[in-house]
Each structure stands twice: as C-alpha cells, then as structure tokens.
Amino acid sequence: MGNEVPRASSFQMLMLLLLLLLLRAERLRGAELTFELPDNAKQCFHEEVEQGVKFSLDYQVITGGHYDVDCYVEDPMGNIIYRETKKQYDSFTYKTEVKGVYRFCFSNEFSTFSHKTVYFDFQVGDEPPILPDMGNRVTALTQMESACVTIHEALKTVIDSQTHYRLREAQDRARAEDLNSRVSYWSVGETIALFVVSFSQVLLLKSFFTEKRPINRAVHS
C-alpha cells in the first residue's frame, strides 16, 4: 500500500507533463497557412522580427498548373534576401541583421490561367528548452525528465510527418481529380466523334443502295 501512492502520483505527474508537452508542441508550430493564389496574382505576408533572431520559411504548392510558384523575401530596408522562381517547394532560413517588418511574397503572375493552392510554415526564433535551465544544468536528467525529452522529440517527428503526409495526400488527390476530369472530357469527345462517324457511315452506305431513277422530260417541238 505504501508504494502504490507514490507510483500513482508519479503516473499522474507524467501524464500532466505529457499533456503540457503536447500542447507545447502544437503551439511551437508557428504560423501555418494554406491559401488560394489566383492566376496572374501576388500574395504577400508581413512579420515583425527582432534583430539577431532566426526565422525559417517552408512552402509547397499543393495544386494548380505545374505545381510551381515564385517566392521572394524582403528585409525592412527593401533588400531581397531570398528569391526563387517556379519552385514546387523550398525552405529558407535566415538570421536577421536589422529589426523591422520582413515581407515574404508568393507570385503567380507568370501564369495566365492556372489557379494555385500554396501551403507555407513560417517560424520565428529558436525553440526554447523543454525543461527550465536545461542548457546550463550540470546534473544529469532524471528518468522522468529524459522520458519527457524523448516523448517531446517523438511528438515533433509525428507532427512533421503528419504535415508531410497531409500535403502529399492533398496534392495526390488534386492530381487524381484533374486526371479524372481529363479522362471524362476525353471520353465525351470520343463518344461524340464515334457517333458522328457512325452516322456518316450510315448515310454513305444508304447512298450506295439508293436507286437513281432517270427523269423523262417531254420534248416539245
């Protein structure tokens, strides 16, 4: 009986830490957004970042055209610190030199009819340590603390994997729907062409078996 109470208390503490780690992992994902980018259009986003802070940008085109987009990032002085054209996906990490509003834009201006769907994940700063004074402590982690760190890393891996598979599933579904539409249109076109050819052959065969009777006209002197 005496050992069951500490075990129950330790189990409750571990479950509480797991819940906090789960909420923390979700909160530390940063700004994620999936948006529509019309043809011949540009969409920009702004974020104020302190000096000496690292930020990262990951993006991927989910649907539309050749699954490509133009992207560039500007610092507060208007200088281009990143530019790529017609990229399907990419990642960019940068440590700021000045404080101010940084702007990153996605452009579909090179396309005149392809509508795009773009996903991006924008994160600012380094992830804080899971445990207080974790970077400065000289003692070894306890078994529970080590378990929490391991679980936290596993949760991060799970979240990243879920995001990857979610984007991949959305992209594959869009391609399948586009292929299905093309097959449907092609089938309708073949049906119409087959009907026209069949009708023409019937008329041609009918003309072969139609007797042409001479027309007698009276000649008046």
From Swiss-Prot:
Protein name (record): Transmembrane emp24 domain-containing protein 3
Record motif COPI vesicle coat-binding, residues: 208-221
Organism lineage string: Eukaryota, Metazoa, Chordata, Craniata, Vertebrata
Annotated signal sequence range: 1-30
Cytoplasmic face of the membrane: 206-221
Residue ranges annotated for the GOLD domain, each copy included: 42-124
Residue window of motif COPII vesicle coat-binding: 208-209
Major subcellular site: endoplasmic reticulum
Membrane topology (UniProt): Single-pass type I membrane protein
Presence of keyword Translocase: no
